[in-house]
Amino acid sequence: MGLAVLLTACQSKQQHTLVVKLHENWTVSSAHDKQSYPASVPGNIYSDLMDNEIIEDPFVGENEHKVQWVSDSVWVYKSTFTLPNTVLDKQHITLNFDGLDTYATVLLNGEALLNTNNAFRNYTVQVKDLLTAENAIEIQFEPTSTYENKAKAELDVTMPEGNRIFTRKAQFQYGWDWGPVLNTSGIWKDIYIKAWDVAAIDHIYLEENGYTVEEASFNVNVALTNPAVVGNSIEVEVAGKRFIIEVN
């Protein structure tokens, strides 16, 4: 079964959401060394350092022990991007981060935009007033130990499993019986600009009502960026059949 959902505007046929992925022109450098290297987004610092032959493959031999300095360093990712007027003229523009690992400070055109502390969640920031045709973004990642040691010092008891429990990120990066200690950082999911007028679809989820061998019944729940908007409709296509739901 295929499902497609489209938001349309009755008063205008120009109600389209534009998405611009920011995956190009990235570099990475240590905060203590201004030498920069090409970086991949999505990706992580260990992969970028390997690609630039700064470190050896940590999964080979005992190389794991030679690269522990990576997780103790501050890493800065930078990029520039251009936006056309078709994006800049939209009423609403957000900068979206689907995954930053983990303690990051984000600057857009020199302005502090966001601080993150959770690699599992996404972040969305309104940025229309900060954007121009030519833009620069910078993301600085701090070592997790900076925050973990502080959190540990504030407790009167010793917690099991060491520092890992204080940080919301993939726990296997701290080492496991099947894998090395590679506490990485970086932009591990998509970064993108989202621009729209009036309203846009925020997220969609299905709610099952019941099913038999012959058929199933479920609700399609659609959350909008502006749920109070009227004069629009939700078009849902399921298995080739279209349904129109008016927003009122």
Where are these regions (language model features)?
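Sec-dependent signal peptide recognition
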Residues: 1-2
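C-terminal motif of bacterial Sec signal peptides marking the signal peptidase cleavage site
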Residues: 7-9
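Accessory beta-strand-rich segments of carbohydrate-active enzymes
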Residues: 14-32, 72-200, 226-228, 241-243
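Predominantly extracellular/luminal regions of secreted and cell-surface proteins
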Residues: 25-53, 184
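Surface-exposed, low-complexity/disordered Ser/Thr/Gly/Pro/Asn-rich loops and linkers
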Residues: 57-68
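Short, solvent-exposed beta-strand/turn "edge" segments of beta-rich domains on protein surfaces
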Residues: 67-72, 209-213
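Beta-strand-rich binding/interaction modules
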Residues: 106-108, 215-248
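Surface beta-strand/loop "capping" patches
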Residues: 195-228
